[in-house]
């Protein structure tokens, strides 16, 4: 039996120096879960054109919201040849009935516990329409099959995970809808063992946990275990790490090079709307300074388009980023992803006008904002992108970062270029608001499923 695992092209795919910015962790993990007697290959359309005529007995396709239309097109092409297709990932989980129109099987949730059964059921010629993965225990996970990727086609930043879930419940984020709010952790010794298997030619490891300091006692144990590994790593954390000096010092000693931190909004009203309560009591500028003093750079995430945002939000956001010298700003437009509280509210208010999933890349306006027009939000975002990602602005940020990163600052130039490229794509987009019902697909909400059909 031969299984093809397909990563569809992402509309925001960026290449630099002939390489894709980062590889996906999803398909190497699914490949590792495939029964060992089954031949498996990974096809990443972001690095090479996809041959839709390849022989296969089963095709598995993962999809996020922005590349869901492409995933559906690929699925339709393989099904037209009589090959069973499985759709899985965040987007199919949150709109399973929509995904089922393009697949023989839809996997809801995480793959552990169900993927081997899917493969065996297809091998027997008898399968279910839907398989629901439970929240698996993270002990004993197999090592991702990085050997199935041509790693020369990606930047040398492998991904790994130490935990899943997020204790926060931001209204615009689909993470909790997919992984849940209950944090689950891998044994620290297994994380360290996986690091030892990685090709040491990498420049840094990206730890994909949504909040690596979600449980401080676990984070301390993890950071202590990373110190002897002598690696450089990048992770995601809540801003609360700035106020735990012991934990912050340990992160720096363990090789933390940068932290992606969700500031989301500069206004208390915006934070309340996002349900980011933890940020409401923190002094952003003091927290940033504390992190910088440890030699850790910040990838700062900001969202524009909340109901309390007016056209002044763009200048205020730019001025804050410039004043605090955040090394890598990541500014996005509020986007009503499926499975989120935000989407349910905007649908109920009749404010979503764009139902083309390929536009849901967080650089394009898809709804009617409260205090400005869609055109004003898009144009303001475009101005903000031009200001933050001009070459002089990038150089100024990185020159400042030299004071606490030293020569390590060189690694942040390509990342800034990635966001510059993404912003340039958005500059060509012009929103075309229509009636909020026009073009609306029949199925836009997750619905309860009976999975034993």
Question: Model features per residue range: what roles?
Answer:
Residues 98-116, 199, 250-260, 316-331:
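Structural recognition of alpha->loop->beta junctions
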Residues 51, 56-65, 220-226, 310-326, ...:
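Short, electropositive alpha-helical surface patch
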Residues 33, 37, 77, 81, ...:
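Alpha-helical structural signal in soluble globular domains
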Residues 12-13, 96-98, 217, 269-274, ...:
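Flexible glycine/acidic-rich beta-alpha junction loops that bind and position SAM and/or redox cofactors
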Residues 1-200:
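Acidic, low-complexity intrinsically disordered segments
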Residues 86-87, 107, 130-131, 234-236, ...:
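Structural detector of well-ordered beta-strand residues that form the stable sheet scaffold
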Residues 2-5, 39-42, 150-152, 341, ...:
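Radical SAM enzyme core and accessory elements
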Residues 143-299, 306, 311-319:
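Radical SAM [4Fe-4S] cluster-binding motif and immediate context
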